Amino acid sequence: NPTVTPLGNFMHALKGKNAIIISPAPRAEKTSTKTVDLIREALAKNGAPEDLIQIVNDVTIEKSQELMANCDLVIATGGSGLTKAAYSSGTPAYGVGPGNPPVIIDRGYDLKDAAENSIIAVASDNGILCDGDNLLLYPQDLEAEFFEEFRKAGAVVFDNADDVAKFRDALFENGKVRPGLVGKDTNVIAEAAGYNLPEGTKVIGLKIEGVGKDDILGKEIMGP
């Protein structure tokens, strides 16, 4: 996440009496830079050195590699490629790879509450956070009731296999999420699949029959 990750890592670094340099994702450089600028302003207002947090400008792979090779500790948040690069940098590293937490909705739990909280989690920052409720597992006999609560809470649910297949093709290419759809609004994702959504749609729900390797939609998507 281009805002939460720099902020969270900075707070942990500061608590340990460390400075931190952020190497942002290229497509999110403006957002991360704005976040760092706000933190630097807050540091200055409180009489602390602004350079406790810095950011790499015009980031490139080469700059990131140089930074990893010369710092004291690497905290790598991203895909498997980034994590592998961090572990191969020669510098002690903590790596965080893809996340796609499944949420199990048990019988007897408040379906309205489950739907509302899941939508809050996934809609936050357009699903960029990889700890959102990306996969929901629910009792099959409660499907109709759960879907209804999901729709009331602001989701559009596609439960027809042909519709879901179009989203599958739109979201993934050669087994990987299309970068151009990461963190995009629901209407942008829907249009890529050939659909128009009602205004104000917070989350797109897709019914799948398999989990894990049985359906690629069970992978990390990073979108609402």
Feature-to-residue mapping (PLM):
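Conserved small-residue-rich beta-alpha loop and adjacent elements
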Residues: 1-41, 46, 89-91, 100, ...
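ALDH superfamily catalytic-core signature
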Residues: 8, 12-19, 83-212
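Short, ordered loop/turn segments at secondary-structure junctions
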Residues: 24-27, 60, 79-80, 98, ...
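A structured beta-alpha segment of the ubiquitous adenosine-cofactor-binding alpha/beta core
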Residues: 53-71
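Short active-site oxyanion
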Residues: 70-74, 134, 224
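Glycine-rich phosphate-binding loop
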Residues: 74-86
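Short, intrinsically disordered, charge-balanced linker/junction segments flanking boundaries
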Residues: 212, 217-224
